[in-house]
């Protein structure tokens, strides 16, 4: 006679689980009862444009840039605005690649209106500087950017290597500077300058970020930049009555 061996409890549990998985229990809903609510609305975020390489060209000239002897003017490099149409930047930050700067200087001696009179030769020094502002900030009600004297000290600093004051080195950094010695005897003298400045390298990358509260206020002006703005300092120093009129073009290469 053969005896039937009882199955172990573990084997029974395994057999029951296989049956349950193979033939799932169908739940029936009784009339009067409703199914629980399930949120089926999907949240779609706007698709951001991919990064792209662009070049922004800006020209700086006009009456505000006309310099008399021992005067200066400070402006800034305009960054691209943010827009969904494909122009400008696609994020609230950009990668600064390089800058190409070119320009001419019109220098002229002042105070001689008689063309028959021979004017003595007068000299002056024009200084153009690019300065990185790592933490751009302007207090409420203040419109002017830091002057040459606030950054470098007296105008006599134009004759030597430019060095930021000790109390400004924690925020500013000189990227590049150009000096041109100009002379005039009454007529206008023109001097040219040109240079290229590499900003980001394989080992060191410079990013600029923006506040961008909304797309309406997502410009590239100084007040909207939260990190790494670039100031442009114009200075002209001379011991004679001279005027200097620059015309500068700045091409900023960026990824954003």
Swiss-Prot record:
It is a peripheral membrane protein. Pfam families: Gemini_coat. Its main location: host cell. Keywords: DNA-binding, Host cell membrane, Host cytoplasm, Host membrane, Host nucleus, Host-virus interaction, Membrane, Transport, Viral movement protein. GO terms for cellular component: host cell; host cell cytoplasm; host cell nucleus; host cell plasma membrane; membrane; viral capsid. Residues 150-187 are annotated as: Interaction with Arabidopsis thaliana NSI protein. One of its GO terms (molecular function) is structural molecule activity. A motif (Nuclear localization signal) lies at residues 81-96. A motif (Bipartite nuclear localization signal) lies at residues 18-39. Gene3D superfamilies: 2.60.120.20. One of its GO terms (biological process) is DNA transport. It is found in: Host nucleus; Host cytoplasm; Host cell membrane. Belongs to the begomovirus nuclear shuttle protein family. Binds to the genomic viral ssDNA, shuttles it into and out of the cell nucleus. Begomoviruses use 2 proteins to transport their DNA from cell to cell. The nuclear shuttle protein (NSP) shuttles it between nucleus and cytoplasm and the movement protein (MP) probably transports the DNA-NSP complex to the cell periphery and facilitates movement across the cell wall. Binds to single-stranded and double-stranded viral DNA. Interacts with the host nuclear shuttle interacting (NSI) protein. This interaction may allow NSP to recruit NSI monomers to the viral genome and thus regulate nuclear export of viral genome by NSP. This is Nuclear shuttle protein. It comes from African cassava mosaic virus (isolate West Kenyan 844).
């Amino acid at each position: 006679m053969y005896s039937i061996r009882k199955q172990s409890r573990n084997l029974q549990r395994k057999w029951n689980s296989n049956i349950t998985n193979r033939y799932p229990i169908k739940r029936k809903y009784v009339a009067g009862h409703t199914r629980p609510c399930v949120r089926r609305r999907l949240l779609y975020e706007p698709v951001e444009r991919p990064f792209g390489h662009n070049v922004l060209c800006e020209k700086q000239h006009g009456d505000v840039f006309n310099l008399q002897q021992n005067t200066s003017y400070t402006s800034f490099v305009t960054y691209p605005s943010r827009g969904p149409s494909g122009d400008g930047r696609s994020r609230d930050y950009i990668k600064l690649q390089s800058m190409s700067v070119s320009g001419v200087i019109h220098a002229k001696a002042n105070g001689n209106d008689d063309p028959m009179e021979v004017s003595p030769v007068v000299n002056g020094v024009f200084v153009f500087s690019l300065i990185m502002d790592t933490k751009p900030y302007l207090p409420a009600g203040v419109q002017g950017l830091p002057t040459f004297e606030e950054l470098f000290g007296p105008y006599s600093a134009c004759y030597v290597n430019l060095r930021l004051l000790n109390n400004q080195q924690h925020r500013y950094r000189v990227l590049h500077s150009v000096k041109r010695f100009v002379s005039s005897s009454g007529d206008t003298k023109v001097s040219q300058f040109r240079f290229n400045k590499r900003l980001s390298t394989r080992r060191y990358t410079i990013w600029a970020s923006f506040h961008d509260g909304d797309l309406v206020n997502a410009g590239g002006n100084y007040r909207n930049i939260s990190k790494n703005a670039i100031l442009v300092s114009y200075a002209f120093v001379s011991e004679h009555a001279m005027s200097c009129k620059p015309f500068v073009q700045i091409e900023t290469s960026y990824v954003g």
